[in-house]
Structure formats: C-alpha cells, structure tokens
C-alpha cells in the first residue's frame, strides 16, 4: 500500500504523485481495505510512510497482530526505532546523486535487524564508490541484507552488475521489475 506525503525530493523520484495525491482514511478503514484481498503480506511504501508516524506505527502493529507479514519501505531520513520488531524494514540510504544525501539519519542503522534490508539506489560511479565507503565505515556487511539498485534511465543495470562482480561485493542486485514488464510510468502495478 502506498501512503501519501514525503519529506524528501530525490532528483530521480518516480512517485511524485505520492507527495499529495491520496485519500484520507482511518487506520481501521485501511485494515478493512486490506482484508478484502486474499493475501497475508502487506508492504507499506510512499512517499515516506513515516511522515504519518503515529498512524503508520499503529497500522503496522495492528496488521502484525492480525497475522499479516508486514514490510515497510522508508527513505531513511526519519527515525525507525519505534517500528514494531515484527515488521521487516527496507530502508534507503540516499546516495549523492539523489540530492538528499544530507538527510540520511545514520543512527537508524543500529535498529536494523538481520532480516531487514538496506537499499542504495545508485545513479553513477560516484554513488557506487560512496556506497562502498558507507558500507565499510558503518560495518554493514552481515548486519542486514544490502541491496544495490540503479536509478532507472541513468545507469544501465549491466554496468552496476559488472562493478559488483569486479569488486566481489556480497550484495544483492535489485531491479524495479515493474518498469521492465509494464511501461516505466505505469501506476498501481
């Protein structure tokens, strides 16, 4: 589910519609909507879901209590320490080309669990080198899953993969598959 609002303005953002579009709903209304679907996995994304902190925390706790597997995608600029430990966190650290690098809240790293994911969206070689330094400086290897993704249309996936292989990095390469299956600007897929 995609929540509205974001406190960041990344140069490569592909969900600007999530800044303001949306429908006001109570936590219970959201849960009622989720229950209409035959699935037990709920991934909360944005925008930045943690902009709506109290309601978002309440929603995640209630979904976990109801037996759902819950994941949250966050841009890493807002505190994650109060997120229910049953929730899988997928957190970005913003690379220099995003224009939002200074917004990274590095103290969030201490709250990541082994099954959480730390994602770097890489737009160029500078971002790649910066990411390697961040991994080393914060001793991230083995703390959680580390994901490398490309800025769509800026860096060819094969180029990033070749750097990863050349440097023998223990990271997971990730593609936004929906942009390859459907038109890159298709919403709701």
Model-predicted regions and their roles:
Residues 3-4, 8-87:
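Conserved Radical SAM active-site core
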Residues 51-189:
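Conserved AdoMet/S-adenosylmethionine-binding subsite of the radical SAM
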């Amino acid at each position: 589910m995609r929540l509205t609002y974001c406190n960041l303005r990344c140069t490569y953002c592909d969900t600007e519609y999530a800044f303001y579009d949306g429908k006001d709903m109570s936590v219970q209304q959201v849960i009622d909507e989720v229950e209409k679907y035959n699935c037990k996995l709920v991934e909360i994304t944005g925008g930045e879901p943690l902009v709506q902190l109290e309601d978002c925390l309440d929603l995640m706790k209630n979904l976990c209590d109801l037996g759902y597997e819950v994941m949250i995608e966050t841009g890493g600029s807002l505190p994650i320490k109060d997120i229910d430990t049953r929730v899988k966190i997928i957190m970005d650290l913003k690379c220099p080309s995003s224009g939002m690098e200074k917004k990274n809240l590095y103290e969030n790293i201490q709250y990541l669990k082994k099954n959480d994911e730390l994602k770097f969206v890489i737009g160029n070689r500078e971002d790649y080198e910066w990411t390697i330094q961040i991994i080393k400086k914060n001793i991230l290897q083995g703390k959680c899953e580390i994901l490398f993704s490309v800025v769509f249309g800026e860096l060819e996936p094969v180029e990033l993969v070749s750097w990863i292989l050349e440097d023998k990095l223990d990271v997971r390469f990730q593609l936004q598959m929906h942009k390859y299956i459907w038109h890159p600007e298709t919403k709701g897929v």
